[in-house]
Amino acid sequence: FGLLLGICLIVQIVTGLLLAAHYTADTSLAFASVAHMCRNVQFGWLIRNLHANGASFFFICIYLHIGRGLYYGSYLNKETWNIGVILLLTLMATAFVGYVLPWGQMSFWGATVITNLFSAIPYIGQTLVEWAWGGFSVDNPTLTRFFALHFLLPFVIAGLTLVHLTFLHETGSNNPLGIPSDCDKIPFHPYYSTKDMLGFALMLIPLITLALFSPNLLGDPENFTPANPLATPPHIKPEWYFLFAYAILRSIPNKLGGVLALAASVLVLFLIPLLHTSKARSMTFRPLSQILFWTLVANLLVLTWVGS
């Protein structure tokens, strides 16, 4: 899945640059500029649909990649793993600020709700939120800085990816048995390149199908309404890939408690290398750990479902 993530990143950066060329980061023009892109720019509709659904595939790939890392004990490459977790956090931040840019109803209210969570931090919270907003509510300054961040962060991700790969190449990659695989080394080309082409095709076909046939399947219909600070949508919820975390946030009645649980649900990944006690690296021959692992997967799926 690492290769697929790299391809996702390249696709997102290319489509994103093309979109940025036509986008206007201003509250009065953002929504109209996105509509203009889809109507009047050559293949603008396709570029936008690929960019919006490409994000979903990026998250599908990264969740599968993390799941596989957990299953096969890849987290014992501590540096690689920790940079991977930082990559996940950066990706989540990028997706969040990007979601705000079209300036639809859910963009605006999502930004309001999530940035407002920082006010739960004791003592400095309120100041922090007003500093992030650039005022007393989500408004033009917020949109402008979110666009700046959304442009910058993917290049940070690309840089971190190189560091991630550098550390991975220190140890070499893991295998399903979790044992040294020096004796099994084979040339990258044609073997791995062929295997990667299969994964590439299996990702590209659903992505293009989704972008061409039902581009709005995963989006929120509220985003077809321009942002209105005076009308709150009936259900404020993020894109599907954040629903598990959002469900955790919403299920805790205390604001600070919810924020801490939300943060912990992702940051727990940093602790995984410290929690490994087994003599075997991988879960291949550990049925008990397998049960726990698949319970975790089911748990995340249920949270995602409940969150929606």
Swiss-Prot record:
Pfam families: Cytochrom_B_C (PF00032), Cytochrome_B (PF00033). Binds 2 heme b groups non-covalently. GO terms for cellular component: mitochondrial inner membrane. It is a multi-pass membrane protein. Coiled coil: none annotated. Heme b b566 binds at residues 65, 164. GO terms for biological process: mitochondrial electron transport, ubiquinol to cytochrome c. Gene3D superfamilies: Cytochrome Bc1 Complex, Chain C (1.20.810.10). The chain crosses the membrane at residues 1-21, 45-66, 81-101, 146-166, 194-214, 256-276, 288-308. Heme b b562 binds at residues 51, 150. InterPro entries: Cyt_b/b6_C (IPR005798), Cyt_b/b6_C_sf (IPR036150), Cyt_b/b6_N (IPR005797), Cytb/b6-like_sf (IPR027387), Cytochrome_b_C_euk/bac (IPR048260), Cytochrome_b_N_euk/bac (IPR048259), Di-haem_cyt_TM (IPR016174). A ubiquinone binds at residue 169. It is found in: Mitochondrion inner membrane. Its cofactor is heme b. Keywords: Electron transport, Heme, Iron, Membrane, Metal-binding, Mitochondrion, Mitochondrion inner membrane, Respiratory chain, Transmembrane, Transmembrane helix, Transport, Ubiquinone. One of its GO terms (molecular function) is metal ion binding. CDD domains: cytochrome_b_C, Cytochrome_b_N. It comes from the Eukaryota. Heme 1 (or BL or b562) is low-potential and absorbs at about 562 nm, and heme 2 (or BH or b566) is high-potential and absorbs at about 566 nm. Belongs to the cytochrome b family. The cytochrome bc1 complex contains 11 subunits: 3 respiratory subunits (MT-CYB, CYC1 and UQCRFS1), 2 core proteins (UQCRC1 and UQCRC2) and 6 low-molecular weight proteins (UQCRH/QCR6, UQCRB/QCR7, UQCRQ/QCR8, UQCR10/QCR9, UQCR11/QCR10 and a cleavage product of UQCRFS1). This cytochrome bc1 complex then forms a dimer. Component of the ubiquinol-cytochrome c reductase complex (complex III or cytochrome b-c1 complex) that is part of the mitochondrial respiratory chain. The b-c1 complex mediates electron transfer from ubiquinol to cytochrome c. Contributes to the generation of a proton gradient across the mitochondrial membrane that is then used for ATP synthesis. This is Cytochrome b. It comes from Pomatostomus temporalis. The gene is MT-CYB.
